[in-house]
Amino acid sequence: EKIDEIVRILHNEAERYKTKDRLSYYVQSVNQGKRAALARGAEVAKHELVVFVDSDSFLDPFAIRNLVQPFVDLKMGGVAGRTDVANTYTNSLTKMQSVRYYISFRIMKAAEAYFDAVSCLSGPLSCYRKEIVLEHKEEWLNQTFFGQKATFGDDRSMTNFVLKNHRTNYQDTAVCSTIVPNEYPVFLKQQMRWKRSWLRESLMAGSFIWRKEPFVSVMFYIGLVVPILAPVVVIYNLIYIPIVHRVFPTTFLVGLLMMALMMSVVQLILRKSSTWVFGLVFCLYYEAVLLWQMPIAWVTFWKSTWGTRETPQDIEEKRKKEEQRQRKAVRLEEQSEQE
């Protein structure tokens, strides 16, 4: 209903843009999830490029115009735009995420783009060649992992289909902003979901990334192994070494501090932002909290529940837990009667 209202306003107030001829919206008869909605959009699209955006993305007026520029290269299969944080100054959590987004997009994705091998065309704003999306549509919609239907991680999954045989890039001038979680429970659920999808899709990408430019391949495999082994490395340096060898982990702590300072210095020099100190805070928070989500992701990466919204998989998971709770209650009641 809200979309319908917005479209009517556009038709009435933006007549010179001919929105009646250029803008259409479709409502799925049944809520089949985000992937199905994106696939439907690709099916009805009239031109050779399709743009995917998240429902909480705010696009710069020239975002799409800038986003499509790299497609002058006929081998280019997909391009990611830049995502900034819209609610940076809400609290310390959003400030930390703002620092992380800056590093993730303007440093890491920009580096990958140098080799035309961006590993994740992020959901807030990305563009694909329609023919590639339609070619892999059925595989994408019906993707399973360890027998479980894949729901989240649709951006990484589609990126893998594209990256396998095409180039992927990052366009820094195609800017959008997004609302990030400002409460820790929601944030932690989001991070767990992202880690599971990262692990799943990184394992998939590992089967073909070796065919890319050698430097890209080496950095990809290092980037895959290091986060997986990071909890072991931390335990070894902060617990095993001090207890067994009675040596203070100076080298490890100095390295951690230098990494945190690098994030802060980048914010201070390149962005000239007052949030620069939260680069240091984020690194410490990552080591203390987020790092320990990875072992959980190892043993639950097959799970497809969203965590922060009600998907069919979340509803099914709740139903199973409720059934288990009821069975346990019945057993306890039977035991009490026997006593």
Put a short name on every predicted segment:
Residues 1-209, 337-339:
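Non-transmembrane catalytic domains and loops of membrane-associated enzymes and transporters
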Residues 101-110, 130-134, 171-179, 219-234, ...:
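A broadly tuned preference for mixed-charge, low-complexity surface segments
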Residues 180, 184-187, 195, 214, ...:
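Hydrophobic alpha-helical segments and helix-packing faces
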Residues 187, 194, 303-309, 313:
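Tryptophan-centered motif/residue detector
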Residues 204-216, 232-235:
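Membrane-helix boundary elements
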Residues 307-338:
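Cytosolic juxtamembrane C-terminal amphipathic helix followed by a basic/polar low-complexity tail immediately after
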